[in-house]
A protein has these predicted regions:
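Feature for exported/extracytoplasmic and membrane-associated proteins, marking the mature portion
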Residues: 1-90, 109, 123, 129, ...
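Short secondary-structure junction motifs
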Residues: 41-43, 93-95, 231, 242
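Conserved hydrophobic/aromatic pocket- or pore-lining residues that grip, position, or stack substrates
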Residues: 46, 103, 226
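Hydrophobic alpha-helical bundle architecture
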Residues: 86-92, 98-118, 125
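Conserved beta-strand and immediately adjacent loop positions that scaffold enzyme active sites
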Residues: 97, 123, 244
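Glycine-centered coil/turn sites that cap beta-strands in beta-rich domains
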Residues: 208-224, 228-247
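Residue-level signal for well-ordered, solvent-exposed loop/turn and beta-edge residues enriched
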Residues: 251-253
């Protein structure tokens, strides 16, 4: 079925870079091909690695406009531009929105290795014909002087963004949202009043309930290092009963 969907789209946008030069663009090209070919997959996850810039985030000689971070943002921009143009050519741009997400943010100021360490907040980029244009949030207040340990304050919980997309784009009922996210999160004006096909909702027979992932009598402590490859140390406190811990990556693999 996947091969059949891909085979229906022989011509795509010329804005894509040469294959192998932009991993994200290569993936998004395939996604556009499958969507336009009629594959019914609701959510596609693509990946652009390299943002864990503890060192070499900027070029120590040429300045902040050069370095790994600039290169990554350039690839992100290039890939999204080609993807959106491709969807327009394939007449599927009214049916697709995109969102960036990461498992960590960055600090305000660089460390001694010309990089930044893990931080408490990060920007999220949403794109597509149905997305309201503009910036949600205000310019952050940066302490003077700032140090490499200072964080930007989080303005919106990332679960607010997820709730907004699920409700405004996928049409998930509020009761189901509250059950999945474990509480009610105020939504944000992300998706505009753009005409698009109604997405069916799978009927749920009976009440929806989600059990907490960690019982109150068990304390799960921060693992280290984080992120890690290939191993990390996980510690926890319990009252002596058997405990099972499973680790999943961002693609949901155990």
């Amino acid at each position: 079925r996947i091969k059949a969907a891909a085979g229906k789209v022989p011509v795509q946008s010329s804005l894509y870079p040469s294959p192998g030069t932009n991993k994200l663009a290569d993936q998004l090209k395939i996604v556009a091909q499958l969507i336009a070919g009629g594959l019914k997959t609701r959510i596609y996850i693509t990946n652009l690695g390299g943002f864990d810039t503890h060192s070499g985030q900027v070029d120590q000689t040429l300045g902040t406009e050069y370095g790994d971070h600039t290169d990554l943002l350039g690839k992100l921009s290039e890939a999204i531009l080609a993807f959106q143009e491709d969807l327009r050519i394939l007449r599927a741009d009214h049916r697709v929105i995109g969102m960036t997400f990461s498992e960590f943010g960055r600090r305000i100021k660089s460390n001694a290795s010309f990089g930044t360490d893990h931080g408490e907040s990060a920007p999220i980029i949403l794109f597509g014909k149905a997305i309201n244009r503009g910036i949600i949030g205000t310019n952050p207040v940066i302490p003077i002087p700032a140090s490499s340990t200072d964080n930007l304050a989080m303005q919106y919980d990332f679960r607010q963004v997820y709730a907004s997309v699920l409700k405004q784009w996928f049409g998930v009922p509020q009761a189901m949202l509250d059950a999945v996210l474990l509480q009610n999160f105020q939504t944000l004006p992300i998706v505009g009043p753009f005409p698009r096909p109604a997405l069916p909702i799978i009927n749920q027979n009976g009440p929806v309930s989600v059990a907490g992932g960690v019982p109150e009598r068990i304390a799960l402590h921060q693992n280290y290092p984080n992120p890690f490859n290939p191993s990390t140390t996980i510690s926890f406190t319990s009252t002596g009963e058997p405990v099972s811990i499973r680790v999943y990556d961002t693609l949901g693999r155990e």
